[in-house]
A protein has these predicted regions:
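Catalytic-loop region of hydrolases
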Residues: 45-88, 96-97
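Conserved acidic catalytic loop of the alpha/beta-hydrolase fold
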Residues: 145-164
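Conserved alpha/beta-hydrolase "acid-adjacent" motif
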Residues: 317-323
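Short beta-strand/loop motif that positions the catalytic acidic residue
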Residues: 304, 310-312
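N-terminal cap/lid subdomain of alpha/beta-hydrolase-fold enzymes
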Residues: 73-133
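Alpha/beta-hydrolase-fold enzymes
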Residues: 186-187, 191-267
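Conserved hydrolase catalytic core segment
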Residues: 164-165, 170-200
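Catalytic active-site module of serine/aspartate enzymes centered on a nucleophile-bearing elbow/loop
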Residues: 334-369
């Protein structure tokens, strides 16, 4: 989890408590929780960034990239049996540091027990992306392409035939499910946070709105910009923000907190290269692990026969819990957990020490035993 997302989660936690109506008290509580969250977010040890290159990588649309670079980190030691690897796949707006608060000795992903692998997905972080200078010429990659690159890293780069678990959050859950369907022999277990089998109409339309906001910035220049369209990115972040929480949450937090959180979302979006963000969400928009909208999932998901833990958040307006429940019903060995509360989608990234974070961590720890 990035430091910015930790502070955002701390803001969410504060606003989730009873509103006293006194802004000064709210700010004092926020400052204290932000410090605690920042401490929890610090990784137990600084991992070295490594790179794996794939020659002549072919994307699903047929485009071939002469060299595709995947950035990743590893923590912990691979067992003599080579059977203790855990692969953590981040969400759309994050990178390989998304789970830092949960990695280390004695933490959820205990590096005294697991060999933890955290890659940057194709199109972002330090992996090959439009931000490298290719811009609009970067291939229109899919979730399947992201999965194929991560799979190659594990199978060829690290030489692993099996992993103890794959854990994915939102976009990472999309990649994880694709992985389980296409390469079911590799993961012994699968953990999906805010999962679905395909992007629904609500999610696709939200992505269209965000993309339109970016394109309306004069600096966008059809995607061949000389200056990153920061204002368009900021507007996209403001559009995204209210969908990341629930309506009851928005109704009861103090007005200043509402504006502050909206601007934090705008700032997070503005930190991206615009082409990289547009392509990242385009991949999420077209995600469909079933193969045809309007179809039912069971047959397509049959290969994913390993034990699967699905964790959804009540009231999530980005990835509807109903979709996660339906997905759970279609998987041969599924366990479903729903996190209560009104944080909506944000609950999925709640830091350790918060009610949502502890509930998620407890469910994963029990599942990985």
């Amino acid at each position: 989890m990035s430091r910015d997302s930790i502070f955002a989660a701390a803001r969410v936690l504060v606003a989730a408590g009873p509103v006293a109506g006194v802004l000064g008290a709210w700010r004092r509580r926020l400052a204290g929780l932000a410090l605690l969250a920042a401490a929890a977010a610090a990784p137990a040890a600084q991992a070295e960034t490594q790179f794996f290159s794939l020659s002549d990588f072919q994307f699903e649309d047929g485009t071939v990239m002469p060299e595709l670079r995947i950035a990743y980190e590893t923590q912990g030691r691979l067992s003599p049996e080579r059977d203790n690897a855990v692969v953590l796949l981040h969400d759309a707006l994050s990178d390989r540091h998304a789970f830092d608060a949960l990695i280390g000795p004695g933490r959820l992903f205990d590096t005294d027990r697991y060999f933890v692998v955290t890659p940057d997905a194709v199109g972002g972080g330090e992996s090959s992306s439009p931000g490298d200078g290719s811009g609009q010429d970067f291939p229109r990659y899919t979730i399947g392409d992201a999965m194929a690159a991560d799979y190659a890293l594990i199978a060829r780069g690290l030489g692993l035939a099996r992993v103890r678990a794959i854990v994915g959050r939102t976009m990472g859950a999309f990649i994880g499910l694709e992985w389980a369907v296409r390469h079911p022999e590799m993961p012994q277990r699968l953990v999906l946070l805010a999962p679905t089998a395909r992007s629904d109409a609500n999610f696709r339309l939200l992505i269209d709105l965000m993309t339109s906001a970016i394109a309306l910035d004069p600096d966008w220049a059809g995607g061949r910009y000389e200056r990153n369209p920061v204002e368009g990115l900021r507007h996209a972040g403001r559009i995204y923000y209210p969908w990341s929480v629930t309506r009851p949450y928005l109704e009861r937090i103090v007005e200043d907190a509402l504006a502050e959180e909206s601007e934090a979302s705008a700032k997070a979006f503005a930190s991206w290269d615009a082409n990289a963000l547009v392509l990242r969400y385009a991949a999420c928009r077209e995600y469909d692990a079933i193969g045809g909208r309007g179809t039912e999932p069971p047959a397509a998901l049959a290969p994913a026969a390993m034990p699967v833990l699905l964790i959804a958040s009540a009231g999530d307006r980005l990835i509807d819990p109903h979709d996660a429940r339906r997905l759970a019903a279609a998987l041969p060995q599924a366990r479903y957990v729903e996190i209560p509360g009104d944080l909506g989608h944000r609950a999925i990234a709640a830091p350790p020490g918060t009610p949502a974070g502890e509930a998620i961590g407890g469910a994963i720890a029990e599942f990985l035993k």
